[in-house]
Amino acid sequence: MQNPEDHHSDRELSSPSNTTKSNDDKNVEITLDIRDDTMAGQSVKNATKTKAEEAELEALGKNLQKKCSFGATIVRNVSMRMRLPSFKRQPHPPQTFDRSSTAAQNALKGFKFISKTDGGSGWDTVQQRFDELTATSDSLLPRAKFGECIGMNRESEGFALELFNALARRRNITSGCISKEQLKEFWDQIANQSFDSRLRTFFDMVDKDADGRLTEEEVREIICLSASANKLSNIQKQAAEYAALIMEELDRDQKGYIMLENLEMLLLEAPIQPDGEKGLNRNLSHMLSMKLKPTLETNPIKRWYNNLKYFLLDNWRRVWVLLLWIGVMAGLFAYKYVQYKNKAAFNVMGHCVCVAKGAAEVLKLNMALILLPVCRNTITWLRNKTKLGGAVPFDDNINFHKVVAGAIAVGVGIHVLAHMTCDFPRLLNASPEKYKPMEPYFGDQPRNYWHFVKGVEGVSGIIMVVLMSIAFTLASQRFRRNKIRLPRPLNKLTGFNAFWYSHHLFVIVYSLLIVHGIELYLTKEWYKKTTWMYLAIPIILYSGERLLRAFRSSVKDVKILKVAMYTGNVLTLQMSKPQGFNYKSGQYMFVNCAAVSPFEWHPFSITSAPGDEYLSVHIRIVGDWTTKLRDVFSEPSPTGRSGLVADYLQDKINYPKVLIDGPYGAPAQDYKEYEVLLLVGLGIGATPMISIVKDIVNNMKEEKYDHDLEKKTVSGSGRSNFKRVYFYWVTREQGSFDWFKGLMNELAVMDCDGIIEMHNYCTSVYEEGDARSALIAMLQSINHAKNGVDIVSGTRVKTHFARPNWRNVYKRIALNHTDARVGVFYCGAPALTKVLGQLALDFSHKTSTKFDFHKENF
């Protein structure tokens, strides 16, 4: 047998059987599990592959195979096979050897008191921190600094103190300080990877009186400590109830205490399996992992070609739109440049006037074009009623709006600089003979700059530059997102309000632009003054949309049916659905509340489903407008009930009036184009995904009802269109799960066919296996098995800890749905956009499963 140290992962090991034996000897395949410094046998089976397994591997190999132009080959040598003569099953190995293959190995995989460290390289860092923290304390580390020294964050300070106490008790250390030698002993124990050492350390933390027994009160205290470290306030409140549950489970004889072996049993009953790996064939998973392993193309030309090809395949819709736009701008600039090069002004001002006029022509185009991406009704109509969405990236409307704004800023700079630093000085310094052809346009030769500034052209141009500079600055992300902290009263210049109101300065800008275009230099004929021609249609279209919004919101009256304020500062408004308000899941609408601000409209995803008899939105309180909205709706109701968790109707006297406008198209509305969906929501970003899930659930109900009546299903958007829906909701607050608790419970009960997979992640809880969350994991398994309710979310859907391994999520979907096209819809913080988008590209390029990534973009 080969040395297990030659292998670094738990793979199936095999090699040809002994050639000296007869070929008629039966062969078996031994699967070994090698982890760290331990090895255990997992299975003994016939070494001959079944036809099904061969077909499965062959199919995946074909699916993973790409064309030669992509520079990829079939993955070979998935695992080495070792064929041995048949032998009798040997007795089970000793218990310490077999730990690797028990559920405890998975339950305590990574069950560390220090995250992502090891006893070797980690100690050097700990020593360095020790020297820094004890520089003024005679090389003795105080108990209060222990957590900081070993690398725990401040939020785990309480847990670190209890860990210190446990380690000190075992060594009979009674002082509140330790030396470096004692710290090394502590470190060796908490960094020890063996199951028994970790279990003993955790037991010592709970057993505060060191009598070898755990009482119900000690269990309650450690539950409180774990819940506090993981920011699980609800579990803290129910600590006594959960302690009683553990005692009921383990203290069957009602002795009033439990022993170490009872705690081990509890751990064995709560195995942890990394997300994304469940249900994966190990060989297939390894093949895909090898296929996805980054490879560097040595030929720079081929590498550049491959990168360009993938870029064009992934972004062809954006590319052709941008190329068309750039081409039109280049054509207009060249046209004006050549036109003015053949005029008399060229003899005085040279190429400067050509550049200024070329930039001005491009500015006219962009000032017209920038209005089109924000004509939301038009875009929604084109998205819903036409097939243009297949060629035009409507999802990028706001991004294109920003790109055009950048081009306008560049154009203004070129136009102004060309005039101010080149054209005007040349006019001032030209000889009388050379200047004479310019007299019809400028009159007598000017003597200073004031001549150019005081005219209509100069004044209008300066005012436009100032107003656009203000609007552009306040629209930048740092100002709009309140990332810049300014002293009072300048703090009013940041936030959404400043962005919203400053953008209305463009009403003045466009008015001045038309005036500026009429009074422009060097052109007298009216038909050559083309500014108004560029702007006419976009301004009419945009103005019509604003009028339509005002009219529609006043006609479509809504009544508030329900108001609720949830943990995590989320306000829910449930209102009546106006007649004719037809929308799709994933779309959004604008909300206005005159009691907060009569002029402000804010977009929010619709969280109700099209089949519901009401409209609902979930609003996260993050800015000045939403804060005021919460204050308005949280006033005490006339019945005396608290408005923060109120359920009362619109006909109450002091209830604020709400207007809505919409619905508007969004990327998530295209979910019906796919049979397999990956829905990802971060925090409040789950709202459009919830509407999609509700719609699918409603259609499942309709299908079931139709089936019960033995009728043919009428709905075209029902469950039958979807093979699988994966929904990942990641939030950092336990209370967030209350927002959609009813839907999750309903989904867990009725989705018997497993069409919808719900994965909840609470990032405030330390990763599965961390000592600070170990007891939470135990409680979770016990309570879910006994009562069918998750202790973190309070629903039937079990909650995962920390963050998903997104690569494993994609890998699992790619293996489960070969040759499929998967719609990936994401709504949340920008940080995850790049990660999910890049993974979608990687898996689309290297597997037969294609992932189409869509990000919500209001």
Curated annotation (Swiss-Prot):
**How does the UniProt record describe the way this protein sits in the membrane?**
Multi-pass membrane protein
Q: Where is this region: Disordered?
A: 1-27
UniProt-listed CDD domains: EFh (cd00051), NOX_Duox_like_FAD_NADP (cd06186)
Q: Name one GO cellular component term.
A: plasma membrane
EC assignment: the record states: 1.11.1.-, 1.6.3.-
What keywords would UniProt list here?
Calcium, FAD, Flavoprotein, Membrane, Metal-binding, NADP, Oxidoreductase, Peroxidase, Phosphoprotein, Repeat, Transmembrane, Transmembrane helix
Q: Which Gene3D superfamilies match?
A: EF-hand, Nucleotide-binding domain of ferredoxin-NADP reductase (FNR) module, Translation factors
What InterPro entries does its record include? Cyt_b245_heavy_chain, EF-hand-dom_pair, EF_Hand_1_Ca_BS, EF_hand_dom, FAD-bd_8, FAD-bd_FR_type, Fe3_Rdtase_TM_dom, Fe_red_NAD-bd_6
Q: How does it assemble?
A: Monomer and homodimer.
- From the Swiss-Prot or TrEMBL record, give the protein name: Respiratory burst oxidase homolog protein D
Organism, by scientific name, is Solanum tuberosum
